[in-house]
Amino acid sequence: RERIEVNAKGQPIRVLRDIDAMSGKDLQLSIDIGVQLQAAEILRRGQLEPVELGSMSVQRALAKNNDLQAHIALGDDLVLRDVKDRLVPPESGAVVVMDIDSGEVISLVSAPMFDPNLFTGTLLTRDWRRLNSHPRTPLLNRATSGQYAPGSTFKMVVGLAAIEAGVISKNTQFNCSGDMELGNATFHCWRKGGHGMMNIISALEQSCDVFIYEVALKTGIRKIKDMAHRLGLGDVTGIGLPGEKQGIIPSHEWKLANQGRVWTPGETVVSSIGQGYVLATPLQLAVMTARLANGKQVTPRLVKSVGDAAPDFAPLDIDPYALAIIREGMFKVMNGGLGTARNYDLDKSLGGMAGKTGTVQVKRITKAQREEGIVNNIDRPWAERDHALFVAYAPVKRPRYAISVVVEHGGSGSSTAAPVARDILTKLMQKQG
């Protein structure tokens, strides 16, 4: 190889010296390019249909849509039609697929994407401006650096912490009437009429908020924080990619150090459903899911093999019975009669999957918007819509893969993110046989 001097524009000036190459160890990356490309396409299209760009009506619509113009300027000609018959760019978000036993990352998708070849030579100013000013920030690796409120995917953490602390058992029940009073505040369940009597399994199956509120207050934020860290949240994963974020798992100490104020019980309630200060990356959510699936300290890696090295993950030191309860709840999400993702399970011939949906509020619908008739997520500006999340492992009886999906401003985790995971795992498992 050569060491070359370049000018400020990246243009070669002269060769400084030649460096003799040295043989190294055999190295194979874990990313499966076939799965990577399929996962990216499935994420970007979601459940929407592509349109042909050649028609005059489409061209007229493009001329009025700044988001689409910025998207096409990146060289991407995929344009979709949403349920309101509007032309929209592909979905933005992230997908992470891991091998549970080895920790190998099979797919690491971030969308929107860009052509990395732009950086191999002289990067033109106009290309840099397009990338840097794009409204959906294609230069951000959402899989490792995107930090999102995990929403209801965090409920497994709370449930596991409560079981381990002896606060609840498999059969402990609380009544969900649709809301819970705490001091002068009222905290609502997503289901206005309430769910009735819930235990931890049915609460995960139906994603009951009030049950989790009650459990979190009795467990305490310190035990919840400890469990979150044991499952891989709140710390960088060590995957070795630049810019990886560690997320936030808040606590009394965190709030005092960062805001100079004391922690309140209401913040425990909000944190328990994965909102408030709680943040996680899609990679961390995949790690959490892998650890729940096999009870070990699974660590992600991008190198499939270096010589004969093989992982040997230590146990999580969590009661297997407690883990089994949480797994049963995740199974019911996909297979229970009232499971929030019951319509999106894997084909039984592939072994099915266990998962958890999450829908994260980005911004409340204002009174003015309601007066204008805006009451549904899809009617709002894209940047104000809820995020859609989903985590799962498969097959159920002998877990091999863990997946996390985040669709930015995608709406429902059930109807948007879960089918993305199903379709990706279907392709992967059919390929593997």
Tell me the role of every PLM-derived stretch:
Residues 3-24, 28-31, 57-153, 157-407, ...:
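Beta-lactam-recognizing serine transpeptidase/beta-lactamase-like catalytic domain environment
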Residues 32, 36, 285, 413-426:
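Short, charged, low-complexity patches
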Residues 309-314, 420-433:
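Short, gly/Ser/Thr-rich active-site loops of penicillin-recognizing serine hydrolases
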